[in-house]
Swiss-Prot record:
GO molecular function: phospholipase inhibitor activity
The protein, known as: phospholipase A2 inhibitor and Ly6/PLAUR domain-containing protein
Organismal lineage: Eukaryota, Metazoa, Chordata, Craniata, Vertebrata
GN (gene name): PINLYP
Entry-linked Pfam families: PLA2_inh, UPAR_LY6
Taxonomic source organism: Homo sapiens (Human)
Taxonomy, superkingdom: Eukaryota
Disulfide-bonded cysteines: 29-53, 32-39, 46-74, 80-101, 102-107, 126-151, 144-172
């Protein structure tokens, strides 16, 4: 019997062989980042430690202005959360992201709707601040909104081109933010946060 030379048949056979033999074949994900609710990029091979594709759409609201960004890339499965995360880092600084995690080639080529921002105060409060080039920050109490019921404190560095400045943030967050652990790489839509420290507590 002759083997098919069709590329799609060969690819399927290759994937099946990897699965059956436990070879751990590398994952291929679409890679891109752009302003707006869509981005399109090339398929690239993920590094051996990144076994998941991620699609993330983030919306930041600051001083009445809204910015939407989309991110697609490779990520470690333990760093990826499928769902919505909402944070408030000040009275006029809100961020909400919607993410989709998957583990097959090109699975993050889909489309996600821009998440809705719920700015309705829920009666809870947390200390809030943001700071660059620091590991800690202090700030006044701010009102939590929507389903935000935890106070979060986090620090690390930002992957911003060749620069990796430190940052610190505190504020309100949904419980989904608390699944993130130190050492995680967290895409936000515009860049990637490398977390050194994160602490979540129930809002008083």
């Amino acid at each position: 019997m002759r083997l098919s030379r069709r590329p799609e048949t060969f690819l399927l056979a290759f994937v099946l062989l990897c699965t059956l033999l436990g070879l751990g074949c590398p994952l291929h994900c679409e890679i891109c980042t752009a302003a707006g609710s869509r981005c399109h990029g090339q398929m690239k091979t993920c590094s051996s430690d990144k076994d998941t594709c991620v699609l993330l759409v983030g919306k930041a609201t600051s001083k009445g202005k809204e910015l939407v960004h989309t991110y697609k890339g490779c990520i470690r499965s333990q760093d990826c959360y499928s769902g919505v995360i909402s944070t408030t880092m000040g009275p006029k600084d809100h961020m909400v992201t919607s993410s989709f995690c998957c583990q097959s080639d090109g699975c993050n080529s889909a489309f996600l709707s821009v998440p809705l921002t719920n700015l309705t105060e829920n009666g809870l409060m947390c200390p809030a601040c943001t700071a660059s080039f620091r590991d800690k920050c202090m700030g006044p109490m701010t009102h939590c909104t929507g389903k935000e019921n935890h106070c979060v404190s986090l620090s690390g560095h930002v992957q911003a081109g060749i620069f990796k400045p430190r940052f610190a943030m505190r504020g309100c967050a949904t419980e989904s933010m608390c699944f993130t652990k130190p050492g995680a790489e967290v895409p936000t839509g515009t860049n990637v946060l490398f977390l050194h420290h994160i602490e979540c507590t129930h809002s008083p």
